[in-house]
A protein has these predicted regions:
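Compositionally biased intrinsically disordered regions enriched in Thr/Gly
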Residues: 1-204
C-alpha cells in the first residue's frame, strides 16, 4: 500500500539525518562523557577497554495520511565507563516528504511560552513546584531546558525527548516531557491544528 512506499522512500534520509544528529551530539557532549570516564577511571581500572559495538535500529512509530514518525535508537560502546545511547525522532510531512520542524507547527515567537510549559510539565511529572527543586534533582544542570527539534507527535500531544546529558546527568537517563494538545493550543498554527486532529482521530 501507500504506507509501504513511504516507509521505503525515507530510509536514506533517516540514515543521513541520524548520522548528522549523532555527529552533532557527539561534538557537543563528548567532553562530558570523557570527563565521566576520567572520573570513573580514577576510581577503578576498567577492564572493558577493548570491547566496541555500535548499533542503529529504526522503526515507524506513527503513520497516517499526513505524517510519518520514525524512531531511531542509536547506541555505541567504545570501552570505558559509559556507552553512548540516544533516541532520535524524525517526523516527516507526507505531502512534501520533508522533516517537520517546530517552526512548522507553532505560531510566531513561541519559544519562551513553550519553555515555560516544559518547565511546568516537568515540575508536575516530578511532583515539585519550583525550578530550583528540579535543578536540585539534576535537571537543567548539563544543558538548558528549552524546546528542541527532537520530538514526536502522538494522540496525547507533543513529546520532547532529551537524550542523556542534554539536560541532565548520565545517571538520570533520557528525559521525556509530553505537552498535551490542550496545553499548547494557544501556540499552535493552522497546520498543526489539522495535524493534531488527524493524529487524535487515529488514536481513537
Amino acid at each position: 500500500g501507500l504506507g509501504d512506499v513511504y516507509k521505503r522512500q525515507p530510509e536514506e534520509a533517516v540514515k543521513k539525518y541520524t548520522e548528522k544528529y549523532v555527529g552533532d551530539y557527539r561534538n557537543d557532549l563528548e567532553p562530558m562523557y570523557k570527563k565521566d570516564e576520567q572520573d570513573k577511571e580514577d576510581e577503578e581500572s576498567i577492564g572493558a577497554w577493548y570491547s566496541y559495538y555500535k548499533g542503529i535500529e529504526s522503526h515507524v512509530q506513527l503513520c497516517n495520511t499526513l505524517v510519518l514518525t520514525y524512531r531511531i535508537d542509536y547506541n555505541e560502546y567504545t570501552g570505558g565507563a559509559h556507552g553512548i545511547y540516544m533516541s532520535t525522532f524524525l517526523n516527516l510531512d507526507l505531502k512534501t516528504l520533508s522533516p517537520i520542524r517546530l517552526d512548522d507547527l507553532f505560531e510566531g515567537d513561541y519559544k519562551e511560552a513553550l519553555t515555560d510549559l516544559l518547565w511546568k510539565q516537568l515540575m508536575a511529572d516530578n511532583n515539585v513546584s519550583t525550578r530550583q527543586e528540579l535543578e536540585d534533582m539534576g535537571y537543567a544542570t548539563t544543558g538548558d531546558l528549552e524546546p528542541i527539534e527532537n520530538f514526536y507527535l502522538d494522540p496525547t500531544g507533543i513529546t520532547f525527548y532529551y537524550n542523556v546529558y542534554e539536560i541532565a546527568p548520565y545517571v538520570m537517563g533520557a528525559t521525556k516531557i509530553t505537552l498535551s494538545y490542550e496545553d499548547i493550543a494557544p501556540l499552535m498554527n493552522g497546520k498543526f491544528i489539522v495535524l493534531s486532529s488527524a493524529i487524535k482521530t487515529d488514536g481513537e
